[in-house]
Amino acid sequence: MNDETSNTTHFGFRTVPEGEKAGMVHGVFTRVASKYDIMNDLMSGGIHRLWKDAMMDWLAPRPGQKLLDVAGGTGDISFRFLKRAPGAHATVCDMTESMLVEGRQRADAAQMADRLDWVVGDAMALPFASNTFDVYTISFGIRNVTRVQDALNEAFRVLKPGGRLMVLEFSQLPNPAMQWAYDRYSFNVIPVMGQIVANDRDSYQYLVESIRKFPDQETFAGMIRKAGFGLVKYRNLSMGIAALHSGWKI
């Protein structure tokens, strides 16, 4: 029996063989692709837009940079990056073709198609040469990866020396009472929203569960250091509902 079939991981609160998780996650995002951006606004009350602005503020995109936006889906991060960096180019990599289709349509509407490439690919085995990109971003995607450490190792590989990693992800609130209240909202409201708006309760139940399974801020920072990154720092957003993690290939 090979490692892929003998090892297990989590899919939300379920334990599944590692070899099955990617397909299950692919199914989730294929089903929600057409409603993904609308649901992000509803689930967060639009606050995710402020978090992404904070991500860009800290990242400070520069003209001419090459961005790799992994799990970039509909292109939200890439569009923000390109608007702040004249002459920059973005490659959006996602394992779900239907998410990329939504992104291409948005790029065409915004007349930005010539500054973007769209690639179907796996965060754990990126189809790019080493030392290629100036910036690597992943927004609300890394918690869905089967082996997070492998994805971070790949991020380090494809970045140029001096390149920067920036991760935006849901995280853990340091205050137990606030975490309890947030969990009540997440588990009782978000799946119902998913059923009403996207006719898909199960996918949003998974997304909520996946947030609770993701490592806390300090643990994740340690994983980034383990991949080889230096100057690793993080910033809490909305008191820790989400967090930004930054690291450099030095």
Curated annotation (Swiss-Prot):
Single GO MF descriptor: 2-methoxy-6-polyprenyl-1,4-benzoquinol methyltransferase activity
EC number(s) from the headed UniProt entry: 2.1.1.163, 2.1.1.201
Domain of life: Bacteria
GO terms (BP aspect): aerobic respiration; menaquinone biosynthetic process; methylation
Keyword S-adenosyl-L-methionine annotated: yes
Positions of S-adenosyl-L-methionine binding: T74, D94, D122, A123, S139
Pathway(s) per entry: Quinol/quinone metabolism; menaquinone biosynthesis; menaquinol from 1,4-dihydroxy-2-naphthoate: step 2/2; Cofactor biosynthesis; ubiquinone biosynthesis
SUPFAM superfamilies tied to this protein: S-adenosyl-L-methionine-dependent methyltransferases
InterPro entries: SAM-dependent_MTases_sf, UbiE/COQ5_MeTrFase, UbiE/COQ5_MeTrFase_CS
Catalytic reactions of this protein: a 2-demethylmenaquinol + S-adenosyl-L-methionine = a menaquinol + S-adenosyl-L-homocysteine + H(+); a 2-methoxy-6-(all-trans-polyprenyl)benzene-1,4-diol + S-adenosyl-L-methionine = a 5-methoxy-2-methyl-3-(all-trans-polyprenyl)benzene-1,4-diol + S-adenosyl-L-homocysteine + H(+)
Keywords, sorted A to Z: Menaquinone biosynthesis, Methyltransferase, S-adenosyl-L-methionine, Transferase, Ubiquinone biosynthesis
Family per similarity comment: Belongs to the class I-like SAM-binding methyltransferase superfamily. MenG/UbiE family.
PANTHER family: 2-METHOXY-6-POLYPRENYL-1,4-BENZOQUINOL METHYLASE, MITOCHONDRIAL, METHYLTRANSFERASE
Job of this protein: Methyltransferase required for the conversion of demethylmenaquinol (DMKH2) to menaquinol (MKH2) and the conversion of 2-polyprenyl-6-methoxy-1,4-benzoquinol (DDMQH2) to 2-polyprenyl-3-methyl-6-methoxy-1,4-benzoquinol (DMQH2).
Name listed for the protein in its UniProt record: Ubiquinone/menaquinone biosynthesis C-methyltransferase UbiE
Organism from which the protein derives: Cereibacter sphaeroides (strain ATCC 17025 / ATH 2.4.3)
